[in-house]
Regions:
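Arginine/glycine-rich "motif VI" loop of SF2 helicases in the C-terminal RecA-like domain
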Residues: 1-5
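Conserved RNA-binding domains used in RNP assembly and mRNA/RNA metabolism
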Residues: 6-10, 14-15, 21-135
Length: 135
Protein backbone atom coordinates (compact mmCIF):
# COMPACT_ATOMS: atom_id res chain seq x y z
CA UNK A 1 0.00 0.00 0.00
CA UNK A 2 2.84 2.40 0.62
CA UNK A 3 3.61 2.14 -3.11
CA UNK A 4 0.11 3.30 -4.01
CA UNK A 5 -1.41 -0.06 -4.97
CA UNK A 6 -5.12 0.12 -5.66
CA UNK A 7 -5.74 -3.62 -5.46
CA UNK A 8 -4.00 -6.79 -4.28
CA UNK A 9 -4.45 -10.52 -3.79
CA UNK A 10 -2.55 -12.32 -1.04
CA UNK A 11 -0.97 -15.44 -2.57
CA UNK A 12 0.80 -17.43 0.10
CA UNK A 13 1.30 -17.88 3.80
CA UNK A 14 4.73 -19.00 5.01
CA UNK A 15 6.20 -19.90 8.38
CA UNK A 16 8.46 -16.87 8.82
CA UNK A 17 9.80 -13.64 7.37
CA UNK A 18 12.94 -15.26 5.98
CA UNK A 19 10.92 -17.76 3.96
CA UNK A 20 8.69 -14.95 2.76
CA UNK A 21 11.74 -13.10 1.43
CA UNK A 22 13.13 -16.18 -0.31
CA UNK A 23 9.82 -16.89 -2.06
CA UNK A 24 9.42 -13.23 -2.99
CA UNK A 25 12.89 -13.12 -4.58
CA UNK A 26 12.08 -16.12 -6.77
CA UNK A 27 8.74 -14.75 -7.90
CA UNK A 28 10.21 -11.27 -8.50
CA UNK A 29 12.61 -12.76 -11.08
CA UNK A 30 9.61 -13.26 -13.36
CA UNK A 31 7.04 -10.79 -12.12
CA UNK A 32 8.18 -7.19 -12.31
CA UNK A 33 7.36 -4.85 -9.46
CA UNK A 34 7.99 -1.58 -11.25
CA UNK A 35 5.33 1.07 -11.04
CA UNK A 36 5.40 4.23 -13.11
CA UNK A 37 5.02 6.56 -10.14
CA UNK A 38 3.99 9.53 -12.27
CA UNK A 39 1.10 7.59 -13.86
CA UNK A 40 0.12 6.23 -10.45
CA UNK A 41 -0.05 9.76 -9.00
CA UNK A 42 -2.21 10.96 -11.91
CA UNK A 43 -4.49 7.96 -11.26
CA UNK A 44 -3.73 6.74 -14.78
CA UNK A 45 -4.22 3.09 -13.88
CA UNK A 46 -3.65 0.14 -16.18
CA UNK A 47 -6.26 -2.49 -15.36
CA UNK A 48 -4.77 -5.92 -14.55
CA UNK A 49 -6.66 -9.17 -14.02
CA UNK A 50 -5.05 -10.21 -10.74
CA UNK A 51 -6.82 -13.58 -10.69
CA UNK A 52 -5.14 -14.53 -13.99
CA UNK A 53 -1.77 -13.27 -12.74
CA UNK A 54 -2.27 -15.22 -9.49
CA UNK A 55 -3.02 -18.46 -11.38
CA UNK A 56 0.06 -18.02 -13.62
CA UNK A 57 2.32 -17.36 -10.63
CA UNK A 58 1.01 -20.35 -8.68
CA UNK A 59 1.49 -22.64 -11.68
CA UNK A 60 4.94 -21.36 -12.66
CA UNK A 61 6.30 -21.37 -9.09
CA UNK A 62 4.67 -24.54 -7.80
CA UNK A 63 8.10 -26.09 -7.01
CA UNK A 64 9.24 -23.03 -5.05
CA UNK A 65 5.93 -23.00 -3.19
CA UNK A 66 6.22 -26.69 -2.37
CA UNK A 67 9.91 -26.51 -1.36
CA UNK A 68 9.17 -23.68 1.06
CA UNK A 69 6.06 -25.37 2.47
CA UNK A 70 3.99 -22.31 1.61
CA UNK A 71 0.24 -22.48 2.00
CA UNK A 72 -1.68 -21.21 -1.03
CA UNK A 73 -4.35 -18.78 0.11
CA UNK A 74 -7.79 -18.78 -1.45
CA UNK A 75 -8.82 -15.21 -0.79
CA UNK A 76 -10.57 -12.45 -2.62
CA UNK A 77 -9.14 -9.39 -4.26
CA UNK A 78 -8.72 -6.37 -1.96
CA UNK A 79 -9.32 -2.83 -3.20
CA UNK A 80 -7.69 0.24 -1.65
CA UNK A 81 -8.78 3.86 -1.69
CA UNK A 82 -6.68 6.87 -0.81
CA UNK A 83 -7.80 10.28 0.45
CA UNK A 84 -7.32 12.32 -2.73
CA UNK A 85 -9.48 15.34 -3.57
CA UNK A 86 -7.73 16.04 -6.84
CA UNK A 87 -5.14 14.12 -8.88
CA UNK A 88 -2.55 16.24 -10.69
CA UNK A 89 -2.69 16.52 -14.48
CA UNK A 90 1.08 16.91 -14.57
CA UNK A 91 3.30 15.55 -11.80
CA UNK A 92 5.96 17.92 -10.50
CA UNK A 93 8.30 16.38 -7.94
CA UNK A 94 9.14 18.45 -4.85
CA UNK A 95 11.97 17.86 -2.39
CA UNK A 96 13.41 19.56 0.65
CA UNK A 97 16.95 19.80 -0.80
CA UNK A 98 15.84 22.10 -3.61
CA UNK A 99 12.96 23.73 -1.74
CA UNK A 100 13.48 23.76 2.05
CA UNK A 101 10.07 25.39 2.57
CA UNK A 102 7.14 23.82 0.77
CA UNK A 103 3.84 25.67 0.99
CA UNK A 104 0.48 24.86 -0.49
CA UNK A 105 -2.78 23.06 -0.08
CA UNK A 106 -2.56 19.33 0.53
CA UNK A 107 -5.08 17.74 -1.86
CA UNK A 108 -4.28 14.08 -1.32
CA UNK A 109 -2.20 11.25 0.03
CA UNK A 110 -1.44 8.19 -2.07
CA UNK A 111 0.97 5.65 -0.67
CA UNK A 112 4.15 7.41 0.40
CA UNK A 113 3.31 10.55 -1.58
CA UNK A 114 1.78 13.80 -0.37
CA UNK A 115 -0.06 15.51 -3.23
CA UNK A 116 -0.18 19.31 -3.19
CA UNK A 117 -1.90 21.62 -5.69
CA UNK A 118 1.50 22.50 -7.16
CA UNK A 119 3.46 19.25 -6.84
CA UNK A 120 4.07 15.98 -5.02
CA UNK A 121 6.62 14.89 -2.45
CA UNK A 122 7.80 11.37 -1.72
CA UNK A 123 7.72 11.57 2.05
CA UNK A 124 9.58 8.27 2.54
CA UNK A 125 12.55 9.74 0.69
CA UNK A 126 12.70 12.37 3.43
CA UNK A 127 12.51 10.07 6.45
CA UNK A 128 14.63 11.37 9.27
CA UNK A 129 14.00 14.99 8.34
CA UNK A 130 12.58 17.22 11.03
CA UNK A 131 9.76 19.31 9.65
CA UNK A 132 7.34 21.90 10.94
CA UNK A 133 3.76 21.65 9.73
CA UNK A 134 1.35 24.57 9.85
CA UNK A 135 -2.29 24.37 8.89
Amino acid sequence: MDQGAYKAIPLLEVKDRKTSGMVEIEIAKELGDKTNWRKMLKNDIEEVDLLKVRDKVLKKFSKVIEQNKAEVLDVKEYMFEYPVEQYPEKVKSLNFEKTPEIKGKLVGIKGQYLIFEHGVINIRRHQGYEIELDY
